[in-house]
UniProtKB/Swiss-Prot annotation:
Organism whose genome encodes this protein: Clostridium perfringens (strain ATCC 13124 / DSM 756 / JCM 1290 / NCIMB 6125 / NCTC 8237 / Type A)
A GO cellular component entry from the record: cytosol
EC number, as in UniProt: 5.1.1.1
NCBIfam families cross-referenced by the UniProt entry: alr (TIGR00492)
Name of the protein in its database record: Alanine racemase
Residues where N6-(pyridoxal phosphate)lysine is found: 38
Function: Catalyzes the interconversion of L-alanine and D-alanine. May also act on other amino acids.
CDD domains per UniProt: PLPDE_III_AR (cd00430)
Length: 386
């Protein structure tokens, strides 16, 4: 791929992203859709993905850290953006001036935000997190938590935009715990209402709940992995959403050689040829997000066939056995993650090998890997991060 700084790239089909979001919009109806684009939009590239999601049904965005929000604002995105995690108070002026909605789960922090906002003659917009069973961040849904949230709602420099929780098991078949979490949130909100507090945007549904639990939608939903075409688990009702992965990871063959029988490949001599073999070297490794855990286990698609990754994956390179494939040469295109002509090796397959989840596979693709964006099968943009 001549338009990239190196022969490794991720192709992102923006039409597929658009279709995934339209599917989500059709499912949730008129509810607010908060599209989660943290971690560089799960490895897809936040700027172009965010715009596409907003154009096709999303009304809001969510990120994890202040720099992710700044990137979106600097690119001219004006849609509401919430930060799901912690932001140091020294960034308060940035939050307030850029109208970034900060998650709050500590009274003293909220007071400091309020003070900063009053000095600027503005209000800090916040979402209040309630820990209904994730055990991560948020006020506990008890009397003490209620009193703290009521105190935050009374602060003169704070505008409470949202109240939310995060489900920990909504992608599992047994929804009992998710229903318990949901009940705690709705009971907490009722207690606020009984105290004269109305928060306009209540949201709890993540990808698993969006697919399986429409009764948890409240005022809005937060879609993450499903925007990118992957299901959160194998236990959700896939028939509720027709999704397609938008990202394909590709490279070109960098070298081809023949090795005699009983010759070793890569570090540690973990692979030895059993016969005369043809080995191709690919210019991608674990520094690119192609994990060392794939050593000797993954496969790629080349010339319409599968080829096995052999030996240990190196920092910048790995090797495949192409003995069974004719006429493999330098420059041939290889699919490391994706599908072609009925052959598939995607983030789910990779995650199974590595003992992880498809989310991590996508997020691992590093900034060394250029992103190529396509619409109508035409390249519309290329990003070389480094």
């Amino acid at each position: 791929m001549d338009i990239c700084v190196r022969p490794v790239w991720a192709e992102i089909d923006l039409d597929i992203i658009a279709n995934n979001m339209k599917e989500i919009r059709n499912l949730v109806g008129e509810k607010e859709i908060i599209a989660v684009v943290k971690a560089n939009a799960y490895g897809h590239g936040a700027l172009d993905i965010a715009s596409t999601l907003l154009e096709n049904g999303a009304s809001r965005l969510a990120v994890a850290i202040i720099t992710e929000a700044d990137e979106l604002r600097d690119a001219g995105i004006t849609a509401p953006i919430m930060i799901l995690g912690y932001t140091p108070i020294n960034f308060a002026e940035n939050l307030i001036n850029n109208e970034i909605e900060q998650t709050v789960y500590d009274v003293e922090y909220a007071k400091e935000l309020s003070d900063f906002a009053l000095k600027l003659g503005k209000k800090a917009k916040v979402h209040i997190a309630i820990d209904t069973g994730m055990g991560r961040i948020g006020f506990l849904p008890n009397e003490e938590g209620l009193n703290k949230v009521l105190e935050i709602c009374s602060l003169p420099g704070v505008e409470v935009i949202g109240l939310f929780t995060h489900f920990s098991t909504s992608d599992e078949k047994d929804k009992t715990y998710t229903y318990e979490q949901f009940s705690k949130l709705t009971a907490f909100n009722k207690a606020l209402e009984d105290n004269g507090i109305h928060i306009p945007l209540k949201h709890a549904s993540n990808s698993g709940a969006i697919m399986d639990l429409p009764e948890t939608y409240l005022d809005g939903v937060r879609c993450g992995i499903i925007s990118y075409g992957y299901y959160p688990s194998e236990e959700v009702k896939k028939e509720n959403l027709k999704l397609k992965p938008a990202l394909t990871l590709k490279t070109n063959v960098a070298f081809v050689k023949e090795l005699d029988e009983d010759m070793y490949v890569s570090y540690g001599r973990t692979y030895k040829t059993e016969k005369k073999s043809k080995i191709a070297t690919l210019p991608i490794g674990y520094a690119d997000g192609y994990s060392r855990l794939l050593s000797g286990k993954a496969k790629v698609i080349i010339k319409g066939q599968f080829a096995n990754v052999i030996g240990r994956v190196c920092m910048d390179q790995c090797m495949i056995d192409v003995t069974h494939i004719e006429d493999v040469k330098i420059g041939d295109e290889v699919i490391l993650l994706g599908e072609e002509n009925g052959l598939k090796f995607d983030a789910n397959d990779m995650a199974e090998i590595m003992g992880t989840i498809n989310y991590e596979i996508l997020c691992m693709i590093s900034h060394r890997v250029p992103r190529i964006y396509k619409k109508n099968n035409e390249i519309v943009k290329v990003i070389n991060y480094i």
